[in-house]
Amino acid sequence: MPIEFIATSKLPTAFGEFNISVFQDPVTGEEHVALSKGLENPPTGPVLVRVHSECLTGDAFASLKCDCGPQLQATQKLINEAGQGVILYLRQEGRGIGLTNKIRAYALQDQGHDTVDANLLLNLPADARRYDMCSIMLDHLKVKEVKLITNNPLKIQALKDQGINVVDRVPLTVGRNPFNEQYLKTKRERMDHLYQKDDF
């Protein structure tokens, strides 16, 4: 069953004022969030959009094992400066495997396994996320064309498969540090993320 719009409110942040809207799956109770700016009226052109999966360790605890927190903050800054945009914040912790399994995967990474192999050793997919809720959320916000802020070609294709017109990709190369260099290399070499070796 598709997710449903539940509520919206203004949200002042360190990066500017946004609107926060909550959507919920009526069967599972799963909640997803749209953080938007400048969409009080239907947009007349492409809108900056980021599809960001929840990362408690990176987004809330400033973990250096990934680049999720810096990506989220950089996107908020970019959208605030542009005056218009949306972050679809999907509650898909650990690329969809959940927080407990994510920490189990972290323990395997501590032993030298990369982020893909760690998931596979737990008999879990390298990426278990889904994106079918995105079209409903964007349709509610009257967004028809997007400039997608991503390095992940799977997200581009997922939105296109839902009939969303992705007119451009906006690269996002922030957050590299000594603790996540192997993680970024794995995303580039094993998950086909569109990083270049000289991006950082």
From Swiss-Prot:
UniProt remark on cofactor binding: Binds 1 zinc ion per subunit.
Q: In which pathway does it act?
A: Cofactor biosynthesis; riboflavin biosynthesis; 5-amino-6-(D-ribitylamino)uracil from GTP: step 1/4
Q: Which positions carry the signal peptide feature in this UniProt record?
A: none
**So where does GTP get bound?**
50-54, 71, 93-95, 115, 150, 155
Family statement drawn from the similarity comment of this UniProt entry: Belongs to the GTP cyclohydrolase II family.
Alphabetized GO MF terms: GTP binding; GTP cyclohydrolase II activity; zinc ion binding
Chain positions recorded as Zn(2+) binding sites:
55, 66, 68
Q: Does the keyword Nucleotidyltransferase apply?
A: no
* Entry function: Catalyzes the conversion of GTP to 2,5-diamino-6-ribosylamino-4(3H)-pyrimidinone 5'-phosphate (DARP), formate and pyrophosphate.
Q: What are the BP-aspect GO terms?
A: riboflavin biosynthetic process
Q: Which residues are the active-site ones?
A: 127 (proton acceptor), 129 (nucleophile)
Choose one Gene Ontology CC annotation of this protein and give it: cytosol
Q: List the disulfide bonds.
A: none
Q: What is its EC number?
A: 3.5.4.25
The family database entries (SUPFAM superfamilies) matched by this protein are listed as:
RibA-like
Ordered alphabetically, the record's keywords are:
GTP-binding, Hydrolase, Metal-binding, Nucleotide-binding, Riboflavin biosynthesis, Zinc
Q: Which reaction equations make up its catalytic activity? A: GTP + 4 H2O = 2,5-diamino-6-hydroxy-4-(5-phosphoribosylamino)-pyrimidine + formate + 2 phosphate + 3 H(+)
Q: What is this protein called?
A: GTP cyclohydrolase-2
Q: Which NCBIfam families does the annotation name?
A: PRK00393.1, ribA
Q: Which CDD domains match?
A: GTP_cyclohydro2
Top-level taxon of the source organism: Bacteria
EC class of this enzyme? hydrolase
Q: What cofactor(s) does the depicted protein rely on?
A: Zn(2+)
